[in-house]
Structures are given as structure tokens and as C-alpha cells.
């Protein structure tokens, strides 16, 4: 009698049944969720990761940790995909998804060992998830009414920043709020996160970080002119030089007059071009490639500032910031193609010369956060915190509702779902109860990473909630229950709801797998996927 392995090519692997497939998959997801779980919360531990390119990452950002780990186990990969989906949709809450999915599956493993069938567990999880979606709206503790209110927005951002940069949350929240409000369109729902740029400059401390209304490029201007005010700006994507023919040409020169005339023709051509550009009122020229010395000489003579930006991505962003049209042909631009900037100057930040395009009008197209820090790892980590903060702001533009943070929402959800389990007949009540208990992992982890007794902390929060203080979460400083509205620990409603749905669906998908069939991989290592050409995209 033929077995499955006889039908497949040599080297194929096959796992089936509860022990070999389901529990093995659950174990793989547990291993991955254990890695990120200890990074949860303000006192989350950092991970030191060296990726396939030998680049070092020291971070507690789950999205970065998961992206840089080269996970190959199929079940763990599903968890990675869920985290990536959360990152793409919400920009925050990746660790929440991974930790919660891992805990759901841990609880499911307990039920499987008790003898429950996977389909009964899945039914219970689906019922619990549906019930939670019904009751979650009654658990909203704060609603942001005015997105332009700096004080209120800063309060809502603090929680997201504290989980990445604890101690700097007040300062960074204000910085992010200022940057976001500078580029906020009249219709807040159209807010674009790409309009808030980050420029990292080593040196100084985190508190030296500042916001500039406009665009900052860490490079010096060409030539001697380093500052222009109320400037019309022409942007050329190519170099400023005479065009060269594709064919090689030979010139026969018989006397010295012909030699003088030959070079004079080149000079006249460049002078005419620069004169034509200067006559349009242009004060700043931006070039996308090299600039000849002769062209630079005439540009200086007309007192025009010259900036050379070789990255096409940076060039595109500058055009957006100043409202210019990038030109592909060297010549005098028409007024509609010119950009405008209130101030273009070269400033030394630390020891780095930066070209700043500053706009003084009320609404700017782009605002830039200039991040300072002692090491590149700190700069990268602050950039990730800012990225999360900007994404939370974008979420607030669409939905200003907030749930209690600090584990308060999870404990209240657990209480209500356990009451629902008691009222549910049949075997699914066991899986509903385990689903409810899984939420305790969040306050438990917050207590553990803060150095408090997790069991005591959870029982104290339960006691506070039983007395009717449903907004009480864990105060990580004292380890005692405290109102989240006093601590300003708020979690975005949309992000948390999406994360819970994603975690429930991922856990159910893993539980539905009863066989794993893997063909023999092709020889040789697979090349890593190409990322974006521009590191900032």
C-alpha cells in the first residue's frame, strides 16, 4: 500500500494529526510571540538583531524585530504576515497582534490536551470575538472632538510614544503634534503621513530634536551663496552643463583664433542659458546632477544660490515642499513651473551642514522633524517612535475614539467575556473562557517588564474593576491600579479593534491546519527580497 511520501518527490516532509501538526504549529507561534512579548510596553526590553546583511538593530519595536528575523516556519510566517498587515493598516500595535495571537494559541493548546476538537475551539473563539465587537463600543473612555487642539492631541499620542521612548513621551508627543498640525489639510481625513519627514543628524541629545516648517536636506549648497529669502526656485532634473552629442566628434583647428573661438562658443551658450534663467527672477537653482565649473561661475555672477540634489526621491519631495515643477530641459522656465520658498539657507546642525527650505505661511506642504541623538541606533529608534506617533495621528483624523490603556481594557474585556462564557451552553464555553483569559497576557507582561509581581498586579486590577472602577489600569511606577485618564494612557480604538480581529483570525487559521506537507526546497539560498530604492520610502 502506497503512503503519502511514496507519492511525493524524495525529500518531501509530511506531518499530520494533533501532536505533529497542530501542536507543532502552536509551538512555533509561541516561540515567535515570546521573542516580541518582552518588548511590550514602556519598560519593554530591547532586542539585538543582526540581519543577513550583518546590519545591527537594537530596538524594542516589534515591526522591526519581525521584519529582520528571517522566519521560515509556515505557521510562524502567518504570524509575521498578520503583524505586517497591522503595520500597513494602522502603523502601530504589531506587538499587540503577535502577543495576543501567541496567547490565544497557547490557551487553545490547553484545550486540545483536554480533548476538545479544534472545530469546537474555533467556534468558541469566533463567538467570543463577535461578542467582544458588540461590547467594545461601550468601553470607549475618551473621544477626541477637535483634531487641531494641540493639548488634546498630545495627550492622545503620549501612550504610543511611551511604549517606544519611555521618559521622552511628553517631549516627542509635542514635537509630533506640531509637525502634523503644520501639514494638516482642511479635510483632516486626507492627512498624508508622507508629508511629515524625518532627518536624522548624529550628535546632541534627544531633547535637541526640533520641527522645521519645510524641508531639510543634510547637504551643503554649491558655491559661495548660502542664504536666500523670498526666493523663486527652478528645479532641473539633469546637470547644468552643455549638452554632449552621443557620437564622438573631431574638430580640426588650424590656428589660435579658431581655438579661442571654439571655447568662446561654449562660454556664450552657457552664459545665454544662465542669463535667461536669471531674467525670470530665479534666486535659487536646484540641479539633479553635476554642475560644470563654467556654469557655476555664471550662476555666482548673477548672485543665484545653487543646490545639488542627486537623489530623485529627495528632488521629488523638495518639489512638493516648494510647489515647483521638475524640468528636464535646461532653459528659462515659465512662471507656473517655478517654486517659491520664504527662506532657503544653509545651517550647521551639530557638525552637519544642512540645506533648509523654510516656509513661513500657516500651512506648509511638508514639515520636517530634525532628530538628534548620540548614536545611530538611538536615532533609528526615535524615528520608529515618530513613525508610530504620526500613524496614530492619522488614525485620530479618521476616528477620535480611545480605549483605556495600561491593561485596563484587557481586564474589563476578560471580565465581560468570562461572564458571557458562564451564560453560554455547550463545549464552546470552555474556549470562550480561555479566549477571555488570554487578554490577561497584556497587563501581566506590563507588570513583568516593570519589575512588579504580575499575579498580584492583575488581581488588584480585577478588584478595582469589580468595585466599578473600570478605567483603572496598571501604574508601572507603583505597580498599583490607577485611572488611565489621570495617567493619560489611551489606546486608539480603531487600531486595537483591528488588532483583536487580526489576532483572532490568525489563531483560527493556525488551528484549522491538520496537515503540513512540504516539498524539498530548491538548492542554494534564496536571495532576499529587494526593498525600496530609497531608504525613506
Swiss-Prot record:
PROSITE patterns: TCP1_1 (PS00750), TCP1_2 (PS00751), TCP1_3 (PS00995)
GO cellular component, one term: chaperonin-containing T-complex
Location in or out of the cell: Cytoplasm
This protein's UniProt keywords: ATP-binding, Chaperone, Cytoplasm, Nucleotide-binding
Coiled coil residues, start to end: none
One Pfam short name: Cpn60_TCP1
One GO BP annotation of this record: protein folding
The keyword Repeat appears for this protein: no
Principal place of residence: cytoplasm
Transmembrane portions of the chain: none
Gene Ontology molecular function, alphabetical: ATP binding; ATP hydrolysis activity; ATP-dependent protein folding chaperone; unfolded protein binding
Annotated InterPro entries: Chap_CCT_theta, Chaperone_TCP-1, Chaperonin_TCP-1_CS, Cpn60/GroEL/TCP-1, GroEL-like_apical_dom_sf, GROEL-like_equatorial_sf, TCP-1-like_intermed_sf
Subunit and partners: Heterooligomeric complex.
Family, as annotated: Belongs to the TCP-1 chaperonin family.
Role played: Molecular chaperone; assists the folding of proteins upon ATP hydrolysis. Known to play a role, in vitro, in the folding of actin and tubulin.
Protein name: T-complex protein 1 subunit theta
UniProt organism field: Dictyostelium discoideum
